[in-house]
């Protein structure tokens, strides 16, 4: 048997976004900027940051990590969520001149004695090397929650579902992946306060520029 390592013959790259991205300021860009400035996002994970979220990522580890997340997202939504009525990347959203691209959306109809209530739900899919113990009840995950609240603001809803693939579970041996799904109902005040933070940060940076 003759074996040759030929990894370099098949270089990784980042595919185009499934949803066309409009030029301008994006929610993800603002969130990454705030997280980097406040120390929530460690410098080694920050890559290139910009309000427009137009990044030139060249680090092989970052490219591989992003590809893992994209592969899981594509399989998970298309194979496992669509049968439940979840739409894959339906469209880009915009509010106050800031753009965003939710992973998926669904609509639930709840029938009550007084009539029916239509509930619009934002879905976000993550693949992470974080431990289930670290993530816990999500309260420590500022970037994820801020992303969900900003999408909720643009979609006019307070409801979200976060689907997380913990690639290494809780890191207890033997290492095994764990999937957890969190249903979240924000208050309108939480959604509004989050959006005010992002919008005000954008406005401040544009004045400084």
Listing of model-derived features with the role each one plays in the protein:
Residues 107, 153-155, 197:
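Short alpha-helical scaffold segments that flank and stabilize functional sites
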Residues 74-82, 139-167:
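Metal-dependent nuclease catalytic cores in nucleic-acid-processing enzymes
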Residues 135-141, 157-209:
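Metal-dependent nuclease catalytic regions and adjoining charged, substrate-binding loops involved
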């Amino acid at each position: 048997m003759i074996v040759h390592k030929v990894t370099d013959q098949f270089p990784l790259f980042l595919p185009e976004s499934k949803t066309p991205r409009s030029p301008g300021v994006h929610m993800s860009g603002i969130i990454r900027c705030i997280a980097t400035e406040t120390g929530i996002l460690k410098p080694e994970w920050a890559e290139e940051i910009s309000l427009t979220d137009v990044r030139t990522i060249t680090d092989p580890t970052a490219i591989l990590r992003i590809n893992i997340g994209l592969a899981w997202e594509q399989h998970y939504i298309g194979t496992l969520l669509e049968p439940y009525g979840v739409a894959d990347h339906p469209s880009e959203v915009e509010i106050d001149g800031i753009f965003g691209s939710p992973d998926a959306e669904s609509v639930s109809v709840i029938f009550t004695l007084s009539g029916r209530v239509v509930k619009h739900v934002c879905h976000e899919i993550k693949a992470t090397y974080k431990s289930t113990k670290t993530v816990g009840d999500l309260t420590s995950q500022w970037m994820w929650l801020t992303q969900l609240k900003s999408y909720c603001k643009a979609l006019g809803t307070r409801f979200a579902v976060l689907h997380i693939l913990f690639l290494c579970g809780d890191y207890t041996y033997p290492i095994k992946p764990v999937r957890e799904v969190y249903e979240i109902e924000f208050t309108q005040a939480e959604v509004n306060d989050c959006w005010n933070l992002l919008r005000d940060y954008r406005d401040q940076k544009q004045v400084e520029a």
